[in-house]
Every structure is written in C-alpha cells, then in structure tokens.
Amino acid sequence: RGEMTKEDLVFKQTGDSIVGTNYIRPSAAQKVTGTWDFGADDALKMPEGTLRLALTQAKVSHANILSIDTTEAEGMPGVFRVITAKDIKAAGGTNKINGLVMLPKHNKTDGFERPVLCDEKIFQFGDAIAIVAADTEEHARAAADAVKVEIEELPAYMNAMDAIAPDAAEIHPGVPNAFFETNCIKGPDFDWDSIPDSQQVEIESYCSRQPHLHLEPDCGYGYIDEDGMITVHSKSIGIHLHMPMIADGIGVPMENLRIVQNHAGGTFGYKFSPTNEALIGAAVKILERPVSLVFNQFQNITYTGKRSPAFMN
C-alpha cells in the first residue's frame, strides 16, 4: 500500500542486546510466505536411497501376541527389510522405552514396561509391532498391512475406571493398573452431620481425553552423520528427555545419539512424549541407511500422546 518500504521492515539493531527491541522472529518471513519447511517437507528432500518406513500396528486394544509372520511382506515390491523386536535385541537394544520414573515414592513401576516394538503383548490400539522399510511410502504401507500377527485377544479397558476396577486383568505384567498414587491434599474435614441431607449434593464429574489435532503429521527422519552418530530429526519438544528414554532401548550409547528438533508446526504439548524417535533410531542403526517416517491423520489421532481424561468425585 506504499506505507512502508522493504528497507523499513529490516530490523536495525543498536547496541549489544535485542532485549526490549522489535527484533523480528527469525522464522516470520518464511512462515508468512509459506516457505518454511517442516519435517514432512524435509522428508521429501531426503537423498536418493532413503528408505521410507511404515508400521504394522495393533488393531485391538489388548492381546497376547502368539506369532508374527513377515514372510509375505518381505517378498512384496520395493521392500528392503522388515524389522521386529528380535532385530532390535540382536542389534544390542533392550527394546524397552525408559519411562524416566519420577517421584518413585508414589510410583509402582520402574518405567520399563513399554517396548519399542511389541513382541509378546499388545497394550493399546495402534501399538507398533513391526517396521517395514521400502523404496516408497506406498510400498512400505502395503507391506506393513501384509505382516501377519496371530493374537489371543484380552479384555479391553476403554477408560481408567474400568482399568483400575478390582477384577480388571493386569495390563502390564508385574505392574498394577493403578500404578501411581499421590497424596490427596484438602482442608480440614467438614461436619456433614450439621447439614441436612436435603442440602447435600454429591457430584461425579468427568473431563474427556483431548486430542491435540495438530495439522502437521507426526513425522521424522534419521541417518548416520559424518561423525558416525545415529541422528534423529523429529518434532520433539523434550530432546533432553527423549535421548535417555530411547538410547538403551535401541542399543545406542548416549554419546553416539543425536536428536535434532525440526521446524515444528503445532504440537500443543503432545510431542513432550516420544512417538517416532525410537522407531526411527532403531531403523537407522539396523539398516545403516537414511530413513523417514510420516504418520497419516488416523495414526496421529490413535497413536500419539493426548491430554489425559480426568474423573472426580
């Protein structure tokens, strides 16, 4: 509109500090013009020879795994390899996510109950059972669907109250379903006898689980860098937490592991939890090739962290 020139928009720093100035956010121009590359954009620009990953995921919420047959998937077009838990263990990994248990006085778990790839049991809908690496995402997804998983289905608990009921089956072997308890902090006891029954109300309330519904898919990629380090790029907003959470599980010492935060779209907190980091890291170590993994929206909704529901009485 002629109100400003291009030169007027350029930040001109005076002094040694930008505190209290109109310093322009470094990503502003790219975001406004649509030229800011996010993780899924970076995945499209990976070098020739990059393998695209897809997951074989659980279609039930709770089950014992009786067998995993990858034969058909391994013979499908474009497939380079199918990775299961036994491959992670053969590569020196524990195949366990480290939950970094805090407040151990209140916790009844050591934090190692979650596998990177399920091999004995399914704990939730969408649990990863195998990773397929192929020349295209389409080939990888088709082969992931061809992995045959024989299961013994177990009772599914679709809310916390059902899961902690006295007769509920244990979900994680050796870990009580109500695995964390903390003190109830409240004021002094009230003399309810002084209030007529007609004036007393008991309320049971519930706040639902809230998916973050981010538009950018959960995505990441990895490679072995020039120093020989396993390098994972993701939307992590807890890099300092996610490295120790996955290192032992994939068999990579911390000093040989690097996680880089991609330019991220909205995460709204869901990427405080690791989602794809261990899967990508394990694939890079085993395959020794650059890889990428991009979720679709169904996977975003069913297999990433959520704001937890709450029950109150």
Predicted regions and their residues:
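Conserved catalytic cysteine-centered active-site region
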Residues: D119-I122, P253-E255, I259-V260, K285-N296, ...
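Non-catalytic, substrate/partner-engaging modules appended to enzymatic cores
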Residues: V10, D16-T21, T182-K186, Y206-C207, ...
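Phosphate/diphosphate-binding loops
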Residues: D135-T136, E288-N313
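Conserved beta-alpha junction segments in alpha/beta enzyme cores
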Residues: W36, D189-I250, I301, S308-P309
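Flexible, low-hydrophobicity surface segments
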Residues: R1-V175
